[in-house]
């Protein structure tokens, strides 16, 4: 069954969290209950799942404080991060606009630096993760190297209505953000300036998809969505029916690789 959440739903589940060895932050739960929310609400900890974990969408927005640094770490689930606001750097690479980062399980990444303004990013997972494994303290957990390191960054093209963004699109514009790989990993930006039907790849070609509305409005199956609404589609479901609003939409589709 498709999971759907609006921006308002996430902000209604917003919690302050002080990273033990890092910055102050706010975490807004959009889909599922993540490890931070469990800690804040005093819920019992969940044990790690065997890899790959069962399909379970968990999505949240992180607001990382200005002039802060989130240390390097890794997770035990595959994930995407979509940077939507603020400027900073990811490792040595600058973040100056909307950016997509993917990191497969057991792949160290970061640090994430926020500059003079807070930085906001969505973390999107398709399975349970018990929390960050900080480096270098948890380096021993990587010694077996059962899972190859795999991560990368993709810049989101200018959106409709932005400077240098597309105008008067005839039909639908599809732009690669993360080029698709044979196992299904990839991300595509779909843009329109009118009401069109958007057809993405079959979810069966990967291990689940997130659809994140970056601008405008569209419906995803029976759900009406606007900016920063999102949906998760399991790999055993049909491709969602996505219909842009009368003035168009910019919507990002992110697909996890098969395991």
What is the role of each PLM region?
Residues 52, 67-80, 113-117, 196-211, ...:
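Short, low-complexity cationic-aromatic patches
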Residues 46-89, 93, 98:
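The feature marks the first
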Residues 94-95, 105-134, 224-226, 235-259:
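Ligand-binding loop in jelly-roll beta-barrel domains
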Residues 65, 75-93, 200-221, 227:
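Glycine- and acidic-residue-biased ligand/ion/polar-headgroup-sensing regions
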Residues 99, 228-229:
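Structural motif
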Residues 1-54, 134-188:
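A short, N-terminal "cap"/entry segment at the start of jelly-roll beta-barrel domains
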Residues 53-66, 181-197:
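Short, flexible domain-boundary/linker segments around small modular repeats
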């Amino acid at each position: 069954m498709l999971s759907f959440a609006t921006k308002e739903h996430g902000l209604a589940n917003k919690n302050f969290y002080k990273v033990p060895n890092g910055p102050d932050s706010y975490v807004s739960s959009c889909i599922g209950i993540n490890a931070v929310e469990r800690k804040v609400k005093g819920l019992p900890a969940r044990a790690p799942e065997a890899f790959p974990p069962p399909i379970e969408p968990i999505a949240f927005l992180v607001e990382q404080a200005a002039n802060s640094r989130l240390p390097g770490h890794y997770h035990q689930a595959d994930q995407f991060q979509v940077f939507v606001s603020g400027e900073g750097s990811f490792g040595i690479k600058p973040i100056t606009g909307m950016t997509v980062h993917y990191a497969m399980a057991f792949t160290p990444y970061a640090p994430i630096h926020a500059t003079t303004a807070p930085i906001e990013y969505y973390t999107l997972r398709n399975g349970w993760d018990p929390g960050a494994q900080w480096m270098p303290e948890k380096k021993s957990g990587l010694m077996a190297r059962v899972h190859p390191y795999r991560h990368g960054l993709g810049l989101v093209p200018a959106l409709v209505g932005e400077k240098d963004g597309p105008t008067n699109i005839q039909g639908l514009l599809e732009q690669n953000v993360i080029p698709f790989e044979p196992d299904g990993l990839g991300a595509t930006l779909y843009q329109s300036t009118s009401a069109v039907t958007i057809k993405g790849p079959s979810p069966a070609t990967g291990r689940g998809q997130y659809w994140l509305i970056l601008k405008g409005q569209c419906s995803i199956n029976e759900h009406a969505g606007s900016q920063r609404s999102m949906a998760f589609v399991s790999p055993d479901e049909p491709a969602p029916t996505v219909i842009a609003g009368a003035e168009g939409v910019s919507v990002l589709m992110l697909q996890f690789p098969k395991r």
